[in-house]
């Protein structure tokens, strides 16, 4: 639901009307009370706030610049990967962080321990909660998108992803399409806890590398 909301808000260039704000708030309430998906609820609330103050956010991002944006985003991703690698069940601090992240540090660390990183990727057998399980199984799934690319695709694929993200940030700043930059940043933020970054059925922002994006150009700079 978050990615559908993000796609809609991006198509509207983060300029929403009152009925659209009310609809997004209703979606938040549904997600929180029916599915108990706290992260998506927070992301959609943030989407609403950014839309409400879009002009301020746009000017702020232009002022910050592409280099600072990529540096901060890269640092956050790097910290998460390092914490996952260093995770230990004997640490109270790590356990608190892992609880907040719904076990993502634990299962990510298991991936490092059992498979580690290769140059060109590898097959990793996962056991998720989807489908019908007739027998007991040991749950194991890598949720974090960046870690999935690193483990499944290898160092080469991960470096290619980093280059692509840096290119897109610079492209969106240069082309004055901040709404696309915001969509990328929201997808990147969500990918710290979900596996959908490289799935075009969820995250459509990578298509912007190959399209004419004049529709999304900012009128105020």
Positions of the model-derived regions?
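Hydrophobic transmembrane helix bundles of membrane-integrated enzymes that assemble
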Residues: 1-93, 110-116, 134-220
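Extracytoplasmic catalytic/substrate-binding loops of multi-pass membrane glycan-assembly enzymes
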Residues: 96-109, 119-128, 137-146
